[in-house]
From Swiss-Prot:
Gene3D superfamilies: 1.10.287.1480
Family: Belongs to the universal ribosomal protein uS14 family.
Localization in the cell: Plastid, Chloroplast
GO cellular component, one term: chloroplast
Keyword list, A-Z: Chloroplast, Plastid, Ribonucleoprotein, Ribosomal protein, RNA-binding, rRNA-binding
Function (record text): Binds 16S rRNA, required for the assembly of 30S particles.
Molecular function as annotated in GO: rRNA binding; structural constituent of ribosome
Gene: rps14
A single BP term in Gene Ontology: translation
Entry-linked HAMAP family: Ribosomal_uS14_1 (MF_00537)
Subunit details: Part of the 30S ribosomal subunit.
Record has Nucleotide-binding as a keyword: no
Protein name as catalogued: Small ribosomal subunit protein uS14c
InterPro entries reported in the protein's UniProt record: Ribosomal_uS14, Ribosomal_uS14_bac/plastid, Ribosomal_uS14_CS
Length: 100
């Protein structure tokens, strides 16, 4: 289980990303439309003004049960070992164990 502080930090980053999403998107569109290099540098400076944790690249997908940051399945939102345990316990409808 991940430490609770790491999970809270991830939630904080998610809120910041949602807050500054429109500002980042509009700045990136302006950069692509402006022909002169000096104007692009000005807009690039504005793009760097929001906090670093508001960048979407800083977000990390975590298991919603354990908070584990690795081996996550997007379809379920679970890490690999939790997914395996839940499938074995028949807690995920439609998911079957592979056998050949």
């Amino acid at each position: 289980m991940a430490r609770k502080s790491l999970i809270q930090r991830e939630r904080k980053r998610d809120k910041l990303e949602q807050k500054y999403h429109l500002i980042r998107r509009s700045s990136k569109k302006q950069i692509s439309k402006v022909p002169s290099l000096s104007d692009k540098w000005e807009i690039h400076g504005k793009l760097q003004s929001p906090p670093r944790n508001s960048a979407p690249i800083r977000l990390h997908r975590r298991c919603f049960l354990t908070g584990r940051p690795r081996a996550n399945y997007r379809d379920f939102g679970l890490s690999g070992h939790v997914l395996r345990e839940m499938v074995h316990a028949c807690l995920l409808p439609g998911a079957t164990r592979s056998s050949w």
